[in-house]
């Protein structure tokens, strides 16, 4: 039997083209919501999205069904187990709850705000557009990283998501 795992994507893996390359067996299930978390760009040297606990907030994302081979590919791309850890979360979509696997950035990386590269930013935004995911939380996460990193400049990050 080829059982598939439910996977909650909230960053660059919202992008349908990227997921088709990385995980050819993956099937999008639909938009879902994770309550009690917010998005944040973290990691020195070029920010990547993670989720951080925040009771008054939520993260919109995409639920995928992934095969065992897809999971292995995701583990590789997400730097599991060192950069990201895997967790199980409860997500809601169209009034139905699901338990899904999610990648959450580990310490010390999650404690280091950083702006994303333009390439990563554009990949995430295209995924939002493709799936009808609101972009405002992405902008808020970018602004939070910008405030924390204002005195520093990194060669691969950019000054404003509006340019």
Q: What residue spans do the PLM features occupy?
A:
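Glycine-aromatic micro-motifs
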Residues: 1-163
């Amino acid at each position: 039997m080829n059982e598939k795992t439910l996977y909650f994507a909230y960053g660059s893996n919202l992008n349908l083209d990227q997921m088709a390359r990385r995980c050819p067996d993956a099937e999008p299930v639909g938009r879902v919501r994770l309550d009690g978390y917010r998005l944040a760009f973290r990691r020195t040297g070029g920010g990547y999205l993670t989720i951080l606990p925040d009771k008054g907030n939520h993260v919109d994302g995409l639920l995928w069904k992934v095969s065992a081979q897809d999971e292995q590919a995701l583990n590789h791309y997400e730097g599991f187990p060192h950069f990201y850890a895997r967790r199980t979360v409860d997500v809601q979509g169209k009034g139905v709850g699901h338990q899904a696997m999610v990648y959450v950035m580990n310490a010390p990386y999650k404690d280091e705000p950083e702006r994303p590269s333009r390439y990563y930013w554009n990949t995430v935004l295209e995924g939002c557009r493709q799936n009808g995911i609101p972009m405002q939380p992405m902008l808020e996460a970018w602004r939070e990283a910008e405030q924390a990193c204002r005195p520093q400049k990194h060669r691969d990050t950019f000054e404003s998501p509006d340019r």
